[in-house]
Amino acid sequence: MSRYDLVERLNGTFRQIEQHLAALSDNLQQHSLLIASVFSLPQVTKEAEHAPLDTIEVTQHLGKEAEALALRHYRHLFIQQQSENRSSKAAVRLPGVLCYQVDNATQLDLENQVQRINQLKTTFEQMVTVESGLPSAARFEWVHRHLPGLITLNAYRTLTLINNPATIRFGWANKHIIKNLSRDEVLSQLKKSLASPRSVPPWTREQWQFKLEREYQDIAALPQQAKLKIKRPVKVQPIARIWYKGQQKQVQHACPSPIIALINTDNGAGVPDIGGLENYDADNIQHRFKPQAQPLRLIIPRLHLYVAD
């Protein structure tokens, strides 16, 4: 497929996403809103976009106000839709839930509508990340040449739809991206970097090359069977824990956007019990269960690379 054809499909798919999101917004507003609760988080400014989040103050919104914020959030796809001071790199998150009354027919209709939107979003992401054939650094410029100001994360982010929950509780999750590597795999990566000398501010090309050589020597000095692990922290994320009474099970969802909960009164479902979201405080985290961590020693800080002792 030619690059021109791919761009045509990219634009066409994105237009469909916009159209289907608008139709979903209209459709939801035709249904009876049983309960709605969303939690707005502080705006992240451009100056603070890389700063760690030690505290997050939450503001709750209820009812029709919550619904309006949620429907606008689903369609927030461009930086032109937000304040000039707001970071375009930090994810815009609005945890919460909208609960609508449905019957068997309208439930199926909304399920199909959300499924179609999520399929389009997945297709759009596949075009950008795979079909374009571009490295990650070049994708940004390519996408924004054709869709100026697009917030790609918001375009990729799928909607979460659930049916007949009994309770919904919100909280925070601290996670790490973890990847296990062998010594030889790390050496191979460092060798590629050494073969392509460059400067990385604040280091000159020569200083960076020297730094890479030291890192290579440190890894080469380890036993070949050494267990290496990248453990990169991810900024704290809002989550939702959903309890289904009939199935007697709990399901946890990431909750960057309001969940759409369909309450089927034809089947006797009732309004769920919805909890709040506490302010986040990194110094006051209570772990429900924290397994004993494997002893790790940091060996290359810039890569968050550890070796198991």
Curated annotation (Swiss-Prot):
GO molecular function, one term: DNA binding
Pfam families attached to this UniProt entry: Ter
Any GO CC annotation of this UniProt entry: cytoplasm
GO biological process, one term: DNA replication termination
Record's keyword annotation contains Cytoplasm: yes
InterPro entries documented for this protein: DNA_replication_term_site-bd, Tus_dom1, Tus_sf
Keyword Cytoplasm: yes
Compartments reported by the entry: Cytoplasm
Keywords: Cytoplasm, DNA replication, DNA-binding
Biological role stated in the UniProt entry: Trans-acting protein required for termination of DNA replication. Binds to DNA replication terminator sequences (terA to terF) to prevent the passage of replication forks. The termination efficiency will be affected by the affinity of this protein for the terminator sequence.
HAMAP family: Rep_term_Tus
Family: Belongs to the Tus family.
NCBIfam families per the UniProt record, alphabetical: rep_term_tus
Record protein name field: DNA replication terminus site-binding protein
The organism of origin for this protein: Salmonella typhi
Upper classification of the organism: Bacteria, Pseudomonadati, Pseudomonadota, Gammaproteobacteria, Enterobacterales
Gene: tus
